[in-house]
Amino acid sequence: MEAVDADLELLTSLLEENEAAESNSVESHEASSELDEYDELFDGDEDGSYHESDNGTEEQTVDGVEENFDTLFGDIDDINEEETVAPDTKKQSSVCQDKSKHELEDELRKMQEQMRKLQKQLQQTALAKTSSPGNPMKSPDNKLLLSGKTFQSGPLLERSLTVPKANLQDTPKRKQNLQDKSPLQKQMTSFLSPPDKSSTRPVSSTATQPVLNPVRSPVGQQYPVEKFSGLRLRKPRVSSSEMERKMNGRKLIRLAQLQNKIVTEKLEDEDWVTFGVIVKKITPQSSNNGKTFSIWRLNDLKNLDKYVSLFLFGDVHKEHWKTDQGTVIGLLNANPMKPKEGTDEVCLSVDNPQKVLLMGDAVDLGTCKARKKNGDPCTQMVNLNDCEYCQYHVQAQYKKVSSKRADLQSSYSGHVPKKMARGGNGLRERLCQDGFHYGGVSSMAYATTLASTTAPKKTVQSTLSNMVVRGAEAIALEARQQIAAARKNMVQSDEFKELMTLPTPGALNLKKHFSGVPTQANEKGGQPFQSISASALLKQQKQQMLGARKKRAEEIQKRFLESTEKSEKSSTLVSSERSVFQSPKQGAEFPNAQKMATPKLGRGFAEGEDVLFFDISPPAAKSNTSAQATKLAAIQKLQAKGQTLTKADPNSIKRKRSSSAEELVAQRVASHAPASTKSPDENEPAMKKHREQLAYLESKEFQKILNAKSKHTGILKEAEAEIQERYFDPLVKKEQLEEKMRSIREQECRVVTCKTCKYTHFKPKETCVSENHDFHWHNGVKRFFKCACGNRTISLDRLPKKHCSTCGLFKWERDGMLKEKTGPKIAGETLLPRGEEHGKFLNSH
């Protein structure tokens, strides 16, 4: 009974929440109907206002919203059925007390089943919403409009569906908590509130534009280039089709061409549009009449030196003053303003806020990554798509990138040299190493001080004699005398004497120390060890080698003379003792002496003896006694068996085997042969075997093995791609720097003009400074030129004032900061049909 009463109280509380949610939905509908309509940009040209009143387009947008709503929630038939159930529940609230408890339980069970269905539908729509790539962006208006459709999702609905019966006793407390909540919280917690059809109707066509044209930039995707502005946009606010419609019939003028177009053409007679990026926003200022205005600096990221100033007054300032820096905007029929005196800057203003179109954020706008000379980061704006460095730092960065390869190949160990650590590598130190005389001042004194400071100081061992102490020698003599007296008075024990009698290295060294015997080097009269330089050591070793070589040559000559005398006295003994295969010893013969002309046939015979030739061969050398004994034993065994050895025929070519030996070999082969019989494949022809092998090579199994690849090919490709990226990234950056330097044809700089000497240069002359001429610093433009012969020059005027120093012609052409690289030339380009032109015939007419 108590459980049924708790269910009844829960049902009544849910019905009350449903009524409160309906009242809130009616209030939200009334609030939404009071919203102002948002008019589109560039539409309508009457009385300075731009409104759209096409009913057909409104109906299309409404249909599009309903279709998108269907795709968001899927099948909404069940929700419509729920709408019909809600009025019935209102009627039942009046007679719910008269019904039996069983009927109430059945109704509660049905309601729980319906809630489960709603939960499943909401989960499916949530999954479809997260998985769909083109989710429409919800504006604040859409969030309010669709709030009635969301019911209760997530943990609130799950908690309400899974309430145990034991917790139903706390319903009075929950009812009190629900009464304390705000209407918005009640609407979020109520899961039986019916949807409001009127809330799905859009207020205006522009309010549904984000839903119809969703634009999202996924992470990691390349940003597309906008067609009209030529810039890459992040979070674009206008679709490409909408931009096509807006630009239809209007003239596009680039921001860099605006200055010439304003002067040469009448832009008031036609509709024209220009695009730019807000690169700088000046703090809002107050005019003389007390009204606030703001100024924007616009640029198209093509030429970062020229800017266009846009002034925002009145309503334009109130609506757009919060626009962020870096936003790409479009201007329709902007009004030109008079520039400031002394400048040629283009100034524009807009009289209507709808003439300013916010298109999105510029991806390529950034600041230079280099640092100034004072260490602060550079604040120059750059186009990141072209280069990451401004025109003032691109040359230094290019030199740094070009010299990286030499740095890698050098043998720099990372340790700073001592000279560099002391600061001896500055400009002053390098110039003043040898000294110079300039302007009546000599730098020899500074050079000597520099040499004394940079010279390495020799470390001297700090001893008592080196220190300036009075009576140092007397103190040292007294100490030596005390040590000698202590030695004499020292009593030696018996154990110490026994240890000293042992022939150990320690005992011997101690005896030498006590007896004061000089070292072995001093006994031989050699000089003590001293440190010498490397060059002196090399000279000393060279002298030692020359002396040793000279001694060796003298010994060889002396040995040769002795050997020749012995050979003359007893040549027979020398020839008999020398072995045939014995090589002469090193230094046995004098290399420069002439060899003896003794004939080899008469070797061993003295002068006057007869040489006899015999037909008998010389006697054989005596064999070893052990071999002779084994041979005799074998002969005796053969004779005991009655066998004899036949003498081998010396003229026979093949070795004859006995029949018994052949039989033994055949038996041995048969015993080692395999037991299996020969396969029939061995008897088949070789061509058939070859065909079978080819068939196996063409089989699927072999092709599968042949085409098998490793599982780590993906990782290998990623590693190769990473290596290629590391290799090509520096080259790509270097190429970007080169392209930027080639595109820079002029550059602003600080120059000085001397009115006395009538010149303009990058720095003043010393005479102008010393004589106090009338010169002043100002901004100038340096321009780069090249001649047809390849010579290059820089000028601060429109054209150089001098002829080419190489060819003498005055054919200057505009060029970039970097000299254009020329590749290898073909033979036709290097061919000179007329031969080489000589200097005296050049420029002759």
Swiss-Prot record:
Residue segments, region N-terminal domain: 1-145
Extent of Low complexity compositional bias: 15-26, 120-130, 570-580
Annotated region described as Zinc finger-like 1, given as residue ranges: 368-393
Sequence ranges of Basic and acidic residues compositional bias: 98-116
Stretches for region Zinc finger-like 3: 787-807
Record region (Zinc finger-like 2): 754-773
Region (OB-fold domain), start-end ranges: 217-367
GO CC terms of this entry: nucleus
UniProt region (Disordered), positions on chain: 15-65, 78-218, 564-586, 643-688
Domain statement: Each zinc finger-like domain binds a zinc ion and is involved in both ssDNA and dsDNA binding, as is the OB-fold domain.
PANTHER family: PROTEIN MCM10 HOMOLOG
Subunit description: Self-associates.
Name this protein carries in UniProt: Protein MCM10 homolog
Gene name, Swiss-Prot/TrEMBL: mcm10
